[in-house]
Regions:
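Hydrophobic face of amphipathic alpha-helices that form TPR/SEL1-like repeat modules
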Residues: 1-32
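N-terminal alpha-helical segment of soluble enzymes
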Residues: 32-97, 298, 310
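Short, well-ordered beta-strand elements within core beta-sheets of diverse protein domains
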Residues: 37-44, 58-65, 151, 260-263, ...
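Residue-level signal for inorganic ion chemistry
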Residues: 35, 71, 93, 116, ...
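Rossmann-like NAD(P) dinucleotide-binding subdomain of oxidoreductase/dehydrogenase enzymes
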Residues: 128-270, 398
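Long amphipathic alpha-helix in the N-terminal Rossmann-like dinucleotide-binding domain
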Residues: 54, 73-87, 101-126
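ALDH superfamily catalytic-core signature
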Residues: 9, 234-378, 441, 488-490
């Protein structure tokens, strides 16, 4: 029985002050798997952003005073909504983004729910401190919500990244203006329709449209107390500069070129799956994708040949079909970038082991590409240094532990990475030596709430998916109390 794919409204307005605005100038949102228009959404104006910020500022006056118990209850109710609508949200995310429904059903949507429940839990345990400095002086340290937060989320995980941003900000007592990517705005809009009645007016506001227009205007807006962004390092630098000019903090989760390291004594079958999960999950459109595969020389030929065969078996297909293992890239521009890098690799003398071509035939209307393995003799190749953001992994041979650590760290990025070995001492040595914010050991792309995620070097500033994010959305107030009744005697 064919699935009903008509799961979106025809048009979407903006969510400002708890009210859905009448759709204004409209943009099309496309299904990247077949090129069909899914729905139309509003291209917000500067006045729309002003209204959203004003609503968030007004709502902050009361939202900041709510108790942690009240906020935790709302976060849990939001998680309930996600759980109750798992199939709907999974299908919407799949249609909007192109990723297989088996991923959205098993990962994106459940992880989003878990994120809200996690912050509902940890906010209840937050405490201030009181220090008796001497017999007459007391120092009290409190954390207060930082204010109105401007959040910009990417197209690769629109639903989950919204949860990563919204949950800690709400938990901390902040109000939000959030801007999704113009490539994937629909799943967040649909989600907001379901949870809007749970939140006071103005606490959550959604601005959609072109990043070069409404997104850029947000960066110049003086009404924000903090910015938060997930996306490319290039745009992250731009946002960091904007935040610095306004003297406000920014959380930036940026790009990566992560090393997936396989030693001779790896758990072979599990490692084969881990190499695939590292680069084929979400069609390789993952900031921490294991796009550099380092394999020790003793097992190199066996592992790479087996991996190439596994890549050839991957079922690339319509993402809403249950047996599809890899869906379409998010848009034509991203597919073009991927194919460009395959050509660059060939021009550099790298060998295409498998893949590297756009898929035609029955999938020709969509943005589909073959899972691709490229063999490089050097870590200096552009395909080993530059973020491709697609299902393209560069395979490099290494001899020693010291050599692979040096190559893995030879990157401007430092977001993710993995070590595969049955020797736990080796795993810990290499993990400690890697210049990266997240190291998986004998696994890859596990992203639960409770484990801090963020990058070293140009991969970003700050951490997400952990209670430490509450510190990023709050500011410290110190109340200094003197109980002495006499004059101090200075004057």
């Amino acid at each position: 029985m064919a699935k009903d794919l008509n799961v979106f409204d025809k048009e979407y307005g903006l969510l400002i002050n708890g009210v859905w605005t009448k759709p204004g100038a409209l943009l099309d949102s496309y299904n990247p798997a077949n090129g069909e228009v899914l729905a139309k959404f509003t291209d917000a104006t500067d006045a729309d952003v002003d209204a959203a910020v004003a609503a968030a500022q007004e709502a902050f006056k009361t939202w900041r005073k709510t108790t942690t118990t009240e906020r935790a209850a709302i976060l849990n109710k939001i998680a309930d909504v996600i759980d109750d609508n798992l199939e709907l949200f999974a299908l919407q995310e799949t249609l909007d983004n192109g990723k297989p429904i088996r991923e959205t059903r098993a990962a994106d949507i459940p992880l989003a729910s878990d994120h809200f429940r996690y912050f509902a839990s940890v906010i209840r345990g937050e405490e201030g401190t009181a220090t008796q400095l001497d017999s007459e002086d007391l120092s009290i340290v409190l954390r207060e919500p930082i204010g109105v937060v401007g959040q910009i989320i990417p197209w690769n995980f629109p639903f989950l990244m919204a949860a990563w941003k919204i949950a800690p900000a709400l938990a901390a007592g902040c109000t939000i203006v959030i801007h999704p990517s113009s490539s994937t705005s629909l799943s967040l809009l649909s989600f907001a329709q379901k949870i809007n009645q749970l939140l006071p007016k103005g606490v959550l506001n959604i601005i959609t449209g072109r990043g070069s227009k409404s997104g850029e205007y947000m960066l110049r807006h003086k009404g924000f107390n903090k910015l938060a962004f997930t996306g490319s390092t290039e745009i992250g630098r731009h946002i960091g500069i904007a935040a610095a000019e306004m003297l406000i903090p920014a959380t930036l989760e940026l790009g990566g070129k992560s090393a997936n390291i396989f030693f001779d004594d790896m758990p072979f079958d599990k490692a084969l799956e881990g190499a695939q999960k590292g680069i084929l999950f979400n069609q390789g459109q993952v900031c921490c994708a294991g796009s550099r595969i380092f394999v020790q020389e003793g097992i190199y030929d066996k592992f790479v040949n087996a991996l190439a065969e596994e890549f050839k078996k991957i079922k690339v297909g319509l993402p809403w079909e249950d047996d599809t293992q890899m869906g379409s890239q998010v848009n034509a521009g991203q597919l073009e970038t991927i194919l460009k890098y395959v050509k660059i690799g060939e021009q550099e003398g790298c060998r295409i082991i498998t893949g590297g071509k756009k898929i035609e035939g029955a999938l020709g209307k969509g943005e589909f590409v073959e899972p691709t393995l490229i063999e490089a003799d050097s870590n200096n190749a552009r395909v080993a240094q530059e973020e491709i953001f697609g299902p393209v992994a560069t395979v490099i041979k290494f001899k020693t532990e010291e050599e692979v650590i040096k190559m893995a760290n030879d990157s401007e990025y430092g977001l993710g990475g993995a070590v595969w070995s049955k020797d736990i001492n080796r795993c810990l040595r290499v993990s400690n030596a890697l210049e990266t914010g997240r190291v998986w050991v004998n696994c890859y792309n596990r992203l639960p709430a409770g484990a801090p995620f963020g990058g070293y070097k140009t991969s970003g500033i700050g951490r997400e998916t952990h209670k430490m994010m509450l510190a990023a959305y709050t500011q410290v107030k110190n109340i200094y109390i003197s109980t002495r009744e006499e004059r101090e005697g200075f004057y």
